[in-house]
Amino acid sequence: WDGHGLPIEWKVEEEFRSKNRGKDDVPGDEFRAACRAFAQKWVDVQAKEFRALGIEGEWDNPYLTMKFESEASIVGEFLRMAMGGTLVRGAKPIMWSPVERTALAEAEVEYHDRKVPVIWVKFGVPSREDGAKLVIWTTTPWTIPANQAVSFSTDISYGLFEVETVMSEEELGFPPYAAAGDKLILADKLAQDVLDAAKVSAFKRVEDVDPASLGSLVHPLAKLDPFFQHDVPLLAGDHVTDDAGTGFVHTAPAHGEDDFNAWVSSGRRASDIRDIVSPDGAYQHRDLPQALQGLDIIRTSGKKRGEQGKANPEVIKLLAESGNLLARGITTIRDAHSWRSKAPVIRRATPQWFISMDKPGPNGKSLRENALKAIEDTEFFPAVGRNRLQSMV
C-alpha cells in the first residue's frame, strides 16, 4: 500500500477543520501521526476485504511505503545517488496550489472557466528617442512584479503606431489611459485589436520595427521602486504568436514554463530567476516595495477561498500610477484548479531535485543503463510489463 500522499493529508485536514482546527494550528508531529493512523485504518479495512474475497497475500506483513524501514531505504537510496554525483539541485516552474501549499501533478489538476482581469502594459524603450513604448498583455497582472524579459517572434511583423485621437472621458464614462501622440510598438496583425481595447479612435502606422534591434526595455514599475530598476531584455521565442495579445509576451520565468524555457535557452541562469511568491501564494521578498509585501494572489481560506486576492488590483493600480497601463478589461479563460480544494493553482518556480539518467554512476554506468539491465534480468508476469517499463526508461 502507498500510505503517503496529499489525498490522505487532505482528508485529515478535513477532520481537523471539523473540530475548528486549521492545518497551521496542528503541530507537525501530531498531523503526521493523524495521517499515519488514517492510512493504517484503511489498510486494515482493505486487507480484511481482500481476505474475505479469498485473495492470498502476506496480509500480516504487507509492503507499506509508510513503514519506517521503507522510508529509511528511500532515504538511503537518495543518499547513494547524492554521493554518486547523479543528484542535481535546480528549479523550474511547476503547478502550485496556494491553498494546499504544495506542488501538483498534471493528474491532480482539473480545468474550469473563470473570469480574470486582462491588462495591456507599456514598457519603455531607451534606445528610441521618440518615446515609443512596447506593449504586452497578460491575464495574470500579479506576475508583472516578477517580469524579467519580454519575448518576441522572428516570424511576426511589427510596427510603430501613433495614436491620433482617443475617445473622450464623456463618451466612455471613465478617463482613457491612452492619449493622442502615444507611440506604441505592436504586431501588425494585432494593432487594431489592441488600439480598440485602448479606446483609440484614430491612429496611423509610422514605420516597421525590428524587436531584435531595440535593446533592453524598462520595467513598467521602474519609476516606483528600485526593485524594478533592472534591464528587461528582449528574447526571441518560438512560443510567441500573433493569434491574440500584442505579439509580445511578458516573460516572468518564475511563473510560466514557456517563460522559463525562453529565459534559459537564451543562455541565462535559472539561479537568476526572481522568486517573489511564498508557498501560500503571497508576495514575499525582502526588497519588494512595502505596497506589495504580503499581498495574496488567491484567497486561501474563509468563505471566499479560491477567489482573487489583493495582488492583482494593487498591481493594476501601481501600473496606472506609473503611467504604463494602456488598457484593462475582464476576460474568461480556462484555468487550472486543484481537484481537491477546487481553487485555482498558479505556476511557481520552486527548488527541486533532479536525478540524471545518463551521468555515469559508481559502477561506471548510468542510471538508465543500470535500470535497463535490471529490467532485462527480471522475469515479468505478464511479460508485457517488461515492455512498458523499458519504454518508460
PLM regions with names:
Residues 122, 173-176, 235-242:
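Short, flexible, solvent-exposed loop/turn segments with mixed acidic/basic and small polar residues
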Residues 1-171, 252-257, 262-290, 312, ...:
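N-terminal, positively charged nucleic-acid-binding surface of large information/translation enzymes
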Residues 283-311:
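A short-motif feature that recognizes glycine-rich, charge-decorated loops
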Residues 217-219, 223-279:
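Extracellular/luminal Protease-associated
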Residues 1-6, 158-160, 172-220:
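Carboxylate/His-rich catalytic cores and anion/metal-binding grooves
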Residues 146-148, 172-174, 195-198, 296-297, ...:
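A short, polar/proline- and glycine-enriched secondary-structure boundary/capping micro-motif
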Residues 131-134, 171-174, 181-183, 229-231:
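Short, mixed charged/polar active-site loops
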Residues 136, 186-202, 309-324:
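Short, basic/low-complexity N-terminal boundary segments at the transition from targeting/disordered tails
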